[in-house]
């Protein structure tokens, strides 16, 4: 093969790979509900507004990742690193007879 043809095939492959990645990203995005129109019955409008509210909640929610992993990590850190043994804690000097 000619070097020019190989570079074109590489560029074409990279472009197809980028399009494939972009299409995978757009599939995960929720689809906006369609407006039924101004003369739609009240039931259709109620369904539309409910779907629209759900759509807005989906696209504007905060994403923190898995909810269980920070709790596990916090527990692990607090138990292993921050836990003090009982002999390192200062002893109380409180004497109830002095009061």
From Swiss-Prot:
Entry's localization field: Secreted
BP GO annotations: feeding behavior; neuropeptide signaling pathway
Signal is among the record's keywords: yes
CDD domains: PAH
Alphabetized Gene3D superfamilies for the sequence: 6.10.250.900
Signal sequence interval, chain numbering: 1-28
GO function term, MF aspect, one: neuropeptide Y receptor binding
Predominant cellular place of this UniProt entry's protein: secreted
Superkingdom classification of source: Eukaryota
PTM-bearing positions, type Tyrosine amide: 64
Pfam families: Hormone_3 (PF00159)
Sorted UniProt keywords: Amidation, Cleavage on pair of basic residues, Neuropeptide, Secreted, Signal
Gene Ontology cellular component list: extracellular space
Matching PANTHER family: NEUROPEPTIDE Y/PANCREATIC HORMONE/PEPTIDE YY (PTHR10533), PRO-NEUROPEPTIDE Y (PTHR10533:SF5)
Function: NPY is implicated in the control of feeding and in secretion of gonadotrophin-release hormone.
Protein family: Belongs to the NPY family.
Stated name of the protein: Pro-neuropeptide Y
């Amino acid at each position: 093969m000619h070097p020019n043809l190989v570079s074109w095939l590489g560029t074409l492959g990279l472009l197809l790979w980028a399009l494939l990645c972009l299409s995978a990203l757009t599939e995960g995005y929720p689809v906006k509900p369609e407006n039924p129109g101004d003369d739609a019955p009240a039931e259709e409008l109620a369904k539309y507004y409910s779907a629209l509210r759900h759509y807005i909640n989906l696209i504007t929610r905060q994403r923190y990742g898995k909810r269980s992993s920070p709790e596990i990590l916090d527990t692990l850190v607090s138990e292993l690193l921050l836990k003090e043994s009982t002999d390192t804690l200062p002893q109380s000097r409180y004497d109830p007879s002095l009061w």
